[in-house]
A protein has these predicted regions:
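Acidic-leaning, charged glycine-interspersed low-complexity segments
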Residues: 76-119
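Short intrinsically disordered coil segments
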Residues: 52-58, 78-81
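Residues that cap or initiate secondary-structure elements
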Residues: 43-45, 69-71, 114-118
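Sterically constrained small-residue positions within well-ordered secondary structures
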Residues: 30, 54, 99-101
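Hydrophobic beta-strand residues in large extracellular and virion-surface proteins
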Residues: 7, 11, 18, 63-65, ...
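Short, basic, helix/turn surface patches
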Residues: 47-54, 117-119
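Oligomerization/assembly interface segments of phage tail-like spikes and tubes
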Residues: 55-69, 102-115
Length: 119
């Protein structure tokens, strides 16, 4: 069963730079060159009407790919994400140009990933 942890591990295995929420560039550790990925965990909620007895949580997980252009290289990376990371979950995909960063963003949103709640 895919969980947010499993999806993050799969994304890390692609070999691109990846971080949670945002890269915080410093002089000693600058933001990596494009392409890179950012993952987010925007929401978690109890699952089911009997959420206490079944002890389940439903997480949302988002992966953002940032590339220089919306070109063949970006499409190859998106194909790898879809085939190697997201192959067993439903997702919504958005592609947009980010003017302020002079790059393209592909965002994948996955909702309702079930996991056992921590006790």
């Amino acid at each position: 069963m895919a969980t947010a942890v499993v999806l993050t591990e799969r994304a890390e295995s692609l070999g691109l730079p990846i971080t949670k929420n945002a890269f915080e560039g410093t002089l000693e550790n600058p933001v990596p060159p494009l392409p890179y990925m950012v993952y987010l965990l925007p929401r978690e909620a109890t699952a089911g009407a009997d959420s206490r007895p079944n002890n389940l949580m439903a997480d949302d997980w988002q992966l953002e790919l940032y590339t220089v252009a919306d070109d063949e290289t970006a499409e190859e990376i998106r194909t790898r994400i879809e085939n190697e990371v997201l192959h067993d979950v439903d997702y919504v995909k958005f592609v947009a140009h980010v003017d302020s960063e002079e790059c393209f963003q592909t965002a994948y949103e996955v909702t309702g990933l079930l996991r056992k709640a921590r006790k």
